[in-house]
Amino acid sequence: MSVHALRELFKHKGEKNYEVFSMEDFIGRLESEIGLNDSVVSQGRSLISSISHENFGTVQATDIQDAAAIYNKMQMLVNDYGFERVSSSDPQVRAREERVRENQITAATMAAIACADETKYIRALRGITKAKASNEDHVKVVQHQFNGPAGGIQVFENGVGLENYNEKSQRDFRVVTIGYNLAASRQDEFAERIYPTTVINPIEGGVVQVLPYIAVMKDVYHEVSGVKMDNEEVNMVEAYRDPSILDDESIALIPALDPAGSNADFFVDPALVPPYTIKNEQNLTITTAPLKANVRLDLMGNSNANLLIQRGMLEVSDTIDPAGRLKNLFVLLGGKVVKFKVDRLPRAVFQPDLVGDTRNAVIRFDSDDLVVSGDTTFIDGSADGVINDLKTAKLSLRLSVGFGGTISLSKGDSKFGATDTYVDKVLNEDGQVMDNADPAVKAILDQLTDLAVIGFELDTRFTNTNRRQRGHLLQTRALQFRHPIPMHAPVTLPMDTMTDEGPGEVVKALTVNTNIRNSNNAVKRMLNYLAQLREVVHNGYNRPKFGIIEGALSAVMRPTYRYKELDLEKVIDTIKSKDRWDDVCAAILNCVKAELFPAHRDSNIEAAFRVISGNQDETPMYLFCSDKEIANYLMTKGDDRTLGAYLKYDIVSTNNQLFDGKLVVIPTRAVQQENDILSWGQFFYVSTVIADLPITRGGHQVTREIAAIPFNLHVNNIPFALEFKITGFQKVMGETQFNGKLADLKP
């Protein structure tokens, strides 16, 4: 052997240039320092007693300093031995890689603290598996289901099986514990993108997620007594989708018919326009109808004002808001009534009365564009008589209507009426003006001898200064979701592995199994959650409510699930082989877009992201999750904006056979934060302790084996998923479609 070879053989480990991480050398370094006072294990003694507390590492200054010192030393150690370095130039990829790296170092740091007093740490592990009951409405203890159509996950809840940890280990596995948690606290790329890892300390009762919740309060009253019944709260996220949630109709002025009929003369004849009943936000039931034109009346005295005063919503000094308008006109036409909505037409709004009382408002409405055609219906829903004749003759009428009046805002005294109503012109289907002498036109006009405005409705409110100053009353609180972390089936090795192969090989063997199992569990949890979503949505449930479906965001957004099957052989008809690739890509993406775009809108997910994050520019990124075959077709040639310019996306794939032929599209955050509730899912990892434990084999034989007992949980946050089953790749890409089409045409 040459001198150079001997030098390389005996070269000090610290002088090596590590291109990849060496677990053996890292473990060797830990072993050489394990007994020193400044080792990572020795430094953790001061922290072990408080590690199970929810505020661990965030309150006591000494805890923060000690934990940071251990983390920094652990980071230095792994860096010395070539631990994975972030190299990507893409900022988002770099952020994800750095987050995974930090989580692994954090898991190793927690393991080092655990090794300072394994007995106390194991006691804390027992606490994290047990549900911690709460009587508070805003604290939800989540009980997870670990079985489903995609298979079950073997877990032991409530600390079952931890009794074996009571026995003293016969070997020192502290360095193995640190190395194992460093390597085992990550999943494969597919699982990590869907369920990014968050390392947590063994908190009693499990990990806690916090969701900011904002609601607008709606006052509700008993109809008879006026005693307040409750404050109904409406999720503010829903207001993005449904703006009527923020409408305040509590002080609307509604003309009210007296059940005894004492004020019936102020309303349109019920034989022409039947009265109808409405219920306002205060649970008050009011019977109303259009007001009669050309009649003087006290608008306040014939309204719901007295009901509102009785319930404390108004005072007797409240006046009518000057920001009112004419809402609807009711026109008699050939013996029946047509309603015209005019509130958005010019001159329909109240204007100040410049002559006389300054507390008066006036309306001077006129229009030559009220249309009556064959598509018009009377208020009873019919379209007979003159309407049917217009449809048969393919004609339409343009009515000229003048309507006006004055109202005292302080007293309610008012009078409104029509100044003139007539047919301005008759048009044919080409928009040409017809001669009134035309027989068809004359026959229709002869039926309109009763043409007149007989009634109207106003859109008015009371001023109610106190109510205005109050505005929208909001309710804010932090919803807490507590998840007990289950114990999984142990991963074991024969005891002699430690002696024969060394601690480095023990760590490798245990972590290979753990990594694969955690990654497979992620696929199972995802597919089982999709089945749960499918059942809930197909049963017709489409409103936010936690408990109906798993996921913290179910409290603020509508559960969404859509399923589509795509047989490429039925949709691809390319003649030229060179075009087939592009057509397959386009067919898949068009299928996704047809489902995703309306689902994005209807689910209200964008509003949920903005309210929860507090960032008005926050939007979800859509993750395309597929098998290895489909992933190759998910890019549009020459354009990486697969979802257009508005929605962001990314692609991740797995070779797990449970995902064969599947494409699942889910929303998530582009760059997840620690314990990020806006990630579609999360993987909570708790550092565990490696020991040699008695394991029963075959029901009788008991052997001592090296055991790693994982504590972790995949949690689903966002109740939104689109699932596609795609088939026909082999037929489309591997066979000539043109010949197939010709064969179908042969007699």
UniProtKB/Swiss-Prot annotation:
The record marks 24-25, 54-55, 84-85, 97-98, 118-119, 136-137, 163-164 as: Cleavage. Keywords: Capsid protein, Virion. Transmembrane segments: none annotated. GO terms for cellular component: viral capsid. Cleaved by the capsid maturation protease during capsid maturation. The keyword Acetylation does not apply. It is found in: Virion. It comes from the Viruses. The keyword Transmembrane helix does not apply. Homohexmer. Capsid protein self-assembles to form an icosahedral capsid with a T=27 symmetry, about 120 nm in diameter, and consisting of 1560 capsid proteins. The capsid encapsulates the genomic DNA. The 12 pentameric vertices of the capsid are occupied by other proteins. This is Major capsid protein. It comes from Pseudomonas phage phiKZ.
